C-alpha cells in the first residue's frame, strides 16, 4: 500500500521533473548530442508508462537495491494493474507476489542504503530504447506500458527473462497477446471515430477536428445563405493545381461558417462529385506548435501531417487564421510552416482552405507573394440586414433549445436592424447573433429568479442556522427551538418552489411555451451596450419630450428660437424621423457673450441625457495651433502621443449618445473645420489608427462670439422696442451677423449645419429672472450649512442694477452677487456672527449699503415664503 501511495503522489508531478529523473537515472549528460535520445525516452511516455517506471524505482528501494534493472521494470508492469501489459501478464497467471519471490530468489536483497536517484542498468536502458522502437513499428507516437513489455521481451536476456521462464510464461505467447490487445484497442477507437480498421491518421486526429463528422452528428450550427461563396470554394478545390481557397473578410462575417457549410454539404451528400466523400478537418495551429521544444520537432510534425494527407487523398484541410502559418515554428534558422507547405500547396498535393481577416491578409500574406499566389482569395462580404434576418431565423432553434425559451419574429428583425444602426464597430451577422444570445440569457435569468417571499425565508433560514450553530453546545432548549423553526422554514421554501414548478408546468400544458424574447428585450440590450435610448417612447417620456421647452426655460431665460430648435431636433431623433446617416442635429449658436449659449448645451445634457457630465465639451481655444488637430483624432504613427487616446473620437466611442459641445469655435485653427466636414455630413470620422467612429447619435453644438460687435451696435434697442420692431431688428441683426460668419467660416462648413441660431441680448426683466435663479442656487448652498437666507426686494433691485450690462450678458450679475452678498456673508460667518441654525436677512439701507441681519434683529421686506413663490426652482 505504501508503494502505491508513493507512486500516486509522485504521479502528480510534472513530466519535466520525471524527464529529469530518467535522465539522471540513465546517467545521460544534458548536452546537445543526447537530446534526441533522452527526448525519445520520456517525452512520449503515457501516464501508465510513467507509473510503471515510478513503481520500478519503488520496488528497487523496497529490495534495497541501488539500481533499476529489467526485473524491477517487470515488477512495475505487473504492479501498475490497469494497462494492457498488466492485463496480459495477469491472463498468463503471473501475479506480483510470485514475481517478487522469484526476483528475491535470483538477486536477493540489497544492503538497505538506497540513493535518492536510483540509476538504470545498461540492460534497463536498452529495454527503454527498444520500447521506443516497438512503438514506432506499431505506428504509435507515444510509449505505453504495452511498449515497455514488448521491449522487455525483445531484450530476451536479464533477470526479467529468467523470472518469466521460472513462472512458466512463454515470451512469444505474451508478445502475441499484447499485439492482439493493442489491435483490438485501436479497432475500438477507430470505430468510435468513424474510421475503418486501424488508426491510419494519428497526427491529423491529434492536431485536428473532423468538421464532417461533427456535421453528421448535427453538432454544427446551420449555415444560411452564402451559396456563391461555398460554390466558389468547391470550384477552387476542384482545380488540378493551386487548389487552395482563402476566405477573406472582416471579423464576424462568417468565414468559419463557410467551411462548416461545406462540411454539412459533404455530410448530407449535396455536393459535386469532385468533393464527394471528402473530410473537412480543421487544424489547430496552437496545438501543432505546442510542446515543440527541440529543433526539428515542429518540422517533423508538419511533414507527418502532410504525408498522412497525401496518402488519404480525401482530406480537405481547413486552417482558421491562416496567417499564423507564417513564422510558426521558425526559430534560429529553422523554416516556418508556410515554407514547408508551399511546394505541396502549389502542386495540388494538399487541398487547404484558409481563413483570415483583410488586415491580417494584407499584413502577412500579401508580403509573401510566393505564398499569396498559392491561395485563391474568396471575398466574404458582410451580409445585408435582410440576409442577417434569415441567418437569425436559421439559428433560432439552436438558441431556443439552449436558453429554453422562444424568440418572436419581431425580436429577430430588431436584432438585425438595431445592431446595424447602433453597433457600428462590429460586423453583421456577428453583432446581431450576440444581441439575440444575450437577450435570451437576460429573459431566462429574469424568469429563473426565486420568488421574493422564498428569498426572504431563505435569508431567515441562513440566520437561524448560524444562531443554531452558535448555541448548540450551551443552550439545548434554545437550540431545539431554532431547529424546529429551521425545519418549518425549509418546508415553506420547498412548498413555494414546488408551487412555482407546478405553475410553469401548467403554463406549458396550456400551450404557453415558456418565456418569450420580444423586441423590447433586444432594445434593452442595445441600450445597455451603447447607452443609446432605443426603446419605444413611453407615455412618461412623450410627456417629457412635449414639455421640453418649458423645462429648459427654467435654466435658460429667453432665447426662444434656440430652445425650440434643440427641442425639435431631440423629438425628431426619439420618434425615429431623423436621417439615420447623419448626426441628430448640428447647430452653431452665435451672439454676445454671457447670454446662455454654453448654458443651453449644459441644460440639455442634464435634462435629457441624465447629467451635465454626459456632455463632451471641447474648448476650442486649446486648438489654436495647426498641430493640435492631432489631439482630436490622435497623433499619426511615429509621432509623440500615438499611443494616447484621441480626445474627440475616443470620447464618442465610449459614449455614442451624447451632446458634443465645441465651445468658442472661432478660436480654433481653420484646419479643425476641415476635419469637421465629415462629421457634419456623414456622421463619421476616422481616427489615426484607421478606426471609424460613428457620430450618428450625437447632437453637435458649436458656440461662437463672431458678430458680437455688430449685435452691440445694431441691437441696443432690442428689448425696448415694440414687438414688431423687436422682430424686424432681430432679423436685421441676424442677416448682418450671418454675413460676418460667411467671411470667417468657409461656405462648405456653414452649408452642412442644420441651423445657425442668433442669441438675443438680455433685457433687464430677463436679467432679473436670472438673478432669481442665481440667488436660489446660493440659498441651496447655504441650506447645506444649515443657514437660512432671505433677501429683500430692494436688495434684488440693487443686484440687478449693478449686474445689468447688455454687452456682457448675465456674467456681471454673478460678479454683483459675489461682491454684494457673498463677501458680506463670508465676513459675518468667519466672525461667528452667523452660525448654524440662524435665519439671515439681507437688505439695503437708505444710504444704499448692504446690511446683513440675523432673523431676530430686523424685519425683512420680503418674507422667504413670498420670495420662493416668485422664484423659479433651479
Swiss-Prot record:
SMART domains with a match to the protein in the record: AAA, ClpB_D2-small
Ranges where the UVR domain occurs: 458-492
PROSITE patterns: CLP_R (PS51903), CLPAB_1 (PS00870), CLPAB_2 (PS00871), UVR (PS50151)
Ranges where the record places region Repeat 2: 120-184
Superkingdom field: Eukaryota
Residues annotated for ATP binding in this entry: 249-256, 591-598
Function: May interact with a ClpP-like protease involved in degradation of denatured proteins in the chloroplast.
Predominant location: plastid
Region of interest (Repeat 1), ranges: 45-110
Sequence similarity: Belongs to the ClpA/ClpB family.
Subcellular compartments: Plastid, Chloroplast
Membrane-crossing residue ranges in chain numbering: none
The protein's name in its UniProt record: ATP-dependent Clp protease ATP-binding subunit ClpA homolog, chloroplastic
Domain Clp R: residue ranges: 42-184
Segments of this protein annotated with the region II: 517-708
Region (I): 204-451
MF-aspect GO terms: ATP binding; ATP hydrolysis activity
Keywords: ATP-binding, Chaperone, Chloroplast, Nucleotide-binding, Plastid, Repeat, Transit peptide
Compositional bias segments (type: Acidic residues): 865-874
A GO CC annotation given for this chain: chloroplast
Annotated region (Disordered), positions in chain: 852-874
Amino acid at each position: 500500500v505504501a508503494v502505491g501511495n508513493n507512486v500516486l503522489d509522485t504521479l502528480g508531478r510534472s513530466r519535466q521533473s520525471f524527464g529529469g529523473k530518467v535522465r539522471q537515472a540513465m546517467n545521460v549528460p544534458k548536452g546537445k548530442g543526447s537530446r534526441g535520445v533522452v527526448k525519445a525516452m520520456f517525452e512520449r511516455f503515457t501516464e501508465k508508462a510513467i507509473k510503471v517506471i515510478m513503481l520500478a524505482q519503488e520496488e528497487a528501494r523496497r529490495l534495497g537495491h541501488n539500481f533499476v534493472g529489467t526485473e524491477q521494470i517487470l515488477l512495475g508492469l505487473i504492479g501498475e494493474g490497469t494497462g494492457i501489459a498488466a492485463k496480459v501478464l495477469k491472463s498468463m497467471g503471473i501475479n506480483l507476489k510470485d514475481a517478487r519471490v522469484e526476483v528475491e530468489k535470483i538477486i536477493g536483497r540489497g544492503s538497505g542504503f538506497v540513493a535518492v536517484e536510483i540509476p538504470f542498468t545498461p540492460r534497463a536502458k536498452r529495454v527503454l530504447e527498444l520500447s521506443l522502437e516497438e512503438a514506432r513499428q506499431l505506428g504509435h507516437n507515444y510509449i505505453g506500458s504495452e511498449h515497455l513489455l514488448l521491449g522487455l521481451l525483445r531484450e530476451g536476456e536479464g533477470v526479467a527473462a529468467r523470472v518469466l521462464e521460472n513462472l512458466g510464461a512463454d515470451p512469444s505467447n505474451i508478445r502475441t497477446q499484447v499485439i492482439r490487445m493493442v489491435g483490438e484497442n485501436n479497432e475500438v477507437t477507430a470505430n468510435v471515430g468513424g474510421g475503418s480498421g486501424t488508426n491510419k491518421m494519428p497526427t491529423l486526429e491529434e492536431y485536428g477536428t473532423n468538421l464532417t463528422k461533427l456535421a453528421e452528428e448535427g453538432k454544427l450550427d446551420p449555415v444560411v445563405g452564402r451559396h456563391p461563396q461555398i460554390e466558389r470554394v468547391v470550384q477552387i478545390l476542384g482545380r488540378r493545381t493551386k487548389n487552395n481557397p482563402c476566405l477573406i473578410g472582416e471579423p464576424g462575417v462568417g468565414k468559419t461558417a463557410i467551411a462548416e457549410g461545406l462540411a454539412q454539404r459533404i455530410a448530407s451528400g449535396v455536393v459535386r462529385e469532385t468533393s464527394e466523400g471528402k473530410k473537412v478537418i480543421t487544424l489547430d495551429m496552437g496545438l501543432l506548435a505546442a510542446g515543440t521544444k527541440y529543433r526539428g520537432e515542429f518540422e517533423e510534425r508538419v511533414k507527418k501531417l502532410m504525408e498522412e494527407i497525401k496518402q488519404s487523398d480525401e482530406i480537405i484541410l481547413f486552417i482558421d487564421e491562416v496567417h499564423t502559418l507564417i513564422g510558426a515554428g521558425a526559430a534560429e534558422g529553422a523554416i516556418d510552416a508556410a515554407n514547408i507547405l508551399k511546394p505541396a500547396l502549389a502542386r495540388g498535393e494538399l487541398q487547404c482552405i484558409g481563413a483570415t481577416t483583410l488586415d491580417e491578409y494584407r499584413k502577412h500574406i500579401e508580403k509573401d507573394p510566393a505564398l499569396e499566389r498559392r491561395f485563391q482569395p474568396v471575398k466574404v462580404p458582410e451580409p445585408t440586414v435582410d440576409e442577417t434576418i434569415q441567418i437569425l431565423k436559421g439559428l433560432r432553434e439552436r438558441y431556443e433549445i439552449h436558453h429554453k425559451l422562444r424568440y418572436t419574429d419581431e425580436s429577430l428583425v430588431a436584432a438585425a436592424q438595431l445592431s446595424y444602426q447602433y453597433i457600428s464597430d462590429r460586423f453583421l451577422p456577428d453583432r446581431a447573433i450576440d444581441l439575440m444570445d444575450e437577450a435570451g440569457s437576460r429573459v431566462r435569468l429574469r424568469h429563473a429568479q426565486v420568488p421574493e417571499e422564498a428569498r426572504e425565508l431563505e435569508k431567515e433560514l441562513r440566520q437561524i442556522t448560524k444562531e443554531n450553530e452558535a448555541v448548540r453546545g450551551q443552550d439545548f432548549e434554545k437550540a431545539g427551538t431554532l431547529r424546529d423553526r429551521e425545519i418549518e422554514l425549509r418546508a415553506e421554501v420547498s412548498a413555494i418552489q414546488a408551487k412555482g414548478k407546478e405553475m410553469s408546468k401548467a403554463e406549458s400544458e396550456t400551450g404557453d411555451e415558456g418565456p418569450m424574447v420580444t423586441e423590447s428585450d433586444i432594445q434593452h440590450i442595445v441600450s445597455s451596450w451603447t447607452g443609446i435610448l432605443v426603446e419605444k417612447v413611453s407615455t412618461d417620456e412623450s410627456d417629457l419630450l412635449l414639455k421640453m421647452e418649458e423645462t429648459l426655460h427654467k435654466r435658460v431665460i429667453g432665447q426662444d428660437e434656440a430652445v425650440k430648435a434643440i427641442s425639435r431636433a431631440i423629438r425628431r431623433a426619439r420618434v425615429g424621423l431623423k436621417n439615420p446617416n447623419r448626426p441628430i442635429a448640428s447647430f452653431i449658436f452665435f451672439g454676445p457673450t454671457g447670454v446662455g449659449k454654453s448654458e443651453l448645451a449644459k441644460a440639455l445634457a442634464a435634462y435629457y441625457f441624465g447629467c451635465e457630465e454626459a456632455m463632451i465639451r471641447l474648448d476650442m481655444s486649446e486648438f489654436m495651433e495647426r498641430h493640435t488637430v492631432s489631439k482630436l483624432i490622435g497623433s499619426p504613427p511615429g509621432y509623440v502621443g500615438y499611443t494616447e487616446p484621441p480626445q474627440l473620437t475616443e470620447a464618442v466611442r465610449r459614449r455614442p449618445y451624447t451632446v458634443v459641445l465645441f465651445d468658442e469655435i472661432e478660436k480654433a485653427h481653420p484646419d479643425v473645420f476641415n476635419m469637421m466636414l465629415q462629421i457634419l455630413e456623414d456622421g463619421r470620422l476616422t481616427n489615426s489608427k484607421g478606426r471609424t467612429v460613428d457620430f450618428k447619435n450625437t447632437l453637435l453644438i458649436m458656440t461662437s462670439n463672431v458678430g458680437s460687435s455688430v449685435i452691440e451696435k445694431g441691437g441696443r434697442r432690442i428689448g425696448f422696442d415694440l414687438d414688431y420692431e423687436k422682430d424686424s431688428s432681430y432679423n436685421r441683426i441676424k442677416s448682418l451677423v450671418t454675413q460676418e460668419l460667411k467671411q470667417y467660416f468657409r461656405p462648405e462648413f456653414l452649408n452642412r449645419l442644420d441651423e445657425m441660431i442668433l442669441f438675443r441680448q438680455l433685457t433687464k426683466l430677463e436679467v432679473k429672472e436670472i438673478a432669481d435663479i442665481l440667488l436660489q442656487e446660493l440659498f441651496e448652498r447655504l441650506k447645506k450649512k444649515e443657514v437660512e437666507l432671505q433677501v429683500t426686494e430692494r436688495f434684488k433691485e440693487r443686484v440687478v442694477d449693478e449686474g445689468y450690462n447688455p454687452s456682457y450678458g448675465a456674467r456681471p450679475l454673478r460678479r454683483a452677487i459675489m461682491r454684494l452678498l457673498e463677501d458680506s456673508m463670508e465676513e459675518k460667518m468667519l466672525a461667528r456672527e452667523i452660525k448654524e441654525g440662524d435665519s439671515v436677512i439681507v437688505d439695503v439701507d437708505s444710504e444704499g449699503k448692504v446690511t446683513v441681519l440675523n432673523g431676530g434683529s430686523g424685519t425683512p421686506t420680503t418674507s422667504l415664503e413670498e420670495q420662493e413663490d416668485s422664484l423659479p426652482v433651479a
